């Protein structure tokens, strides 16, 4: 194999596929990036058997071939090469010479034939969204997946298609995030659970352009995200997702409309008095026209009052401040509506069209003086 491409193209391609290289594995071939110049295009691929990423890079193929290079060594070499054309050539015993201007690296490689290729997915059952929409949906839900594997289902997100609506749901046992988007066409009903890790890596790849489109296709075991050049294939999480509809009551005893940034800034200031790992709640005292926020810790205490529009009963309720901050940060509206039933029932933050819904469970607290 002998190929030539620019350093910038190579760096970009390696950076994209490296996200699918496992940090730990007992199979050395999975620590590799496959450089495939066996056809008329140069493709780079990485695959940890759960998540696989392939991308095409521009370049010239002088001699066709295929090779698997250790991802860590390859990416570090490529990153530190001069900004010029890079030549990659292999010998019959899988030695690989990487040349750029006067720099020459000769490294051992593995046969590309041993590499685990991405599964071939027939593109039959798929939807199309913009890169911007996909990036936003991930940003507005990913923070509420569980960060450990105690319950595998909670480490993923539900993608549910019904008609022309895509609903994305995440939860961790303390909160639920729901984002709904309208698709341009109607599609067959579908429910799949996508690993959170896959979505986190995709969000790093997406440029977020409103005009660029992504095709998302489904099989029984896999989901595929097809961008302009990169293709991401991920295993799905098996099982039936949590039944959350019964938790999403539209009843409320108290409704508050408030300026989002003002509330977010106030809670953010309050967290200055909380040490990392400290689970001190923020107490919210809702009365006619005002919301008072109070917090007390070993460091000190703080209270602040914000003007609001209120419907219904007065209420005193406590929350983990981080959960409120996480939800408010991803809402783009200037004003938000908060719905409460009582001090032991969840708070709902949602818009009139319910394009987003954030459910946050309250916490027990001792009244802050």
Predicted regions and their residues:
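Structural preference for solvent-exposed beta-strand-turn elements
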Residues: 1-369
């Amino acid at each position: 194999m002998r190929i030539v491409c620019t350093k910038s193209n190579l760096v970009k391609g390696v950076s994209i596929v490296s996200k699918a290289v496992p940090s730990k594995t007992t199979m050395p071939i999975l620590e590799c990036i496959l450089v495939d110049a066996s056809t008329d295009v140069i493709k780079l691929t990485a695959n940890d058997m759960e998540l696989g990423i392939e991308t095409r890079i521009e370049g010239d193929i002088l001699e066709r071939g295929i090779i698997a290079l250790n991802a860590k060594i390859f990416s570090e070499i490529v990153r530190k090469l001069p900004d010029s054309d890079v030549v990659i050539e292999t010998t019959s015993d899988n030695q690989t010479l990487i040349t750029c201007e006067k720099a020459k690296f000769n490294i051992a490689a593995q046969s590309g034939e041993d590499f685990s290729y991405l599964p071939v997915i027939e593109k039959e059952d798929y939807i199309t969204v913009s890169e911007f929409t996909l990036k936003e949906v991930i940003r507005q839900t990913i923070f509420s997946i569980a960060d450990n594997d105690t319950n595998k289902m909670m480490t993923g997100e539900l993608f549910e298609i019904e008609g022309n609506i895509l609903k994305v749901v995440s939860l961790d046992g303390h909160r639920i995030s729901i984002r709904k988007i309208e698709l341009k066409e109607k599609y067959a009903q579908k429910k799949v659970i996508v690993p959170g890790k896959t979505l986190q890596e995709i969000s790093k790849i997406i440029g977020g352009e409103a005009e660029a489109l992504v095709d998302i296709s489904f099989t029984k075991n896999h989901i595929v995200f097809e961008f302009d050049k990169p293709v991401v294939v991920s295993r799905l999480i098996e099982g039936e997702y949590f039944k959350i509809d019964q938790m999403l009551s539209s009843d409320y005893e108290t409704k508050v409309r408030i300026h989002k940034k003002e509330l977010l800034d106030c809670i953010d200031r309050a967290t200055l008095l909380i040490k990392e790992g400290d689970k001190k709640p923020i107490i919210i005292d809702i009365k006619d026209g005002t919301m008072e926020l109070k917090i007390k810790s070993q460091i000190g205490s703080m209270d602040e009052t914000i003007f609001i529009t209120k419907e219904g009963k007065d209420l005193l309720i406590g929350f983990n401040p981080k959960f409120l901050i996480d939800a408010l940060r991803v809402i783009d509206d200037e004003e938000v509506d908060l719905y409460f039933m009582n001090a032991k029932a969840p708070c709902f933050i949602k818009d009139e069209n319910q394009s987003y819904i954030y459910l946050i469970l309250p916490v027990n607290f001792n009244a802050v003086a």
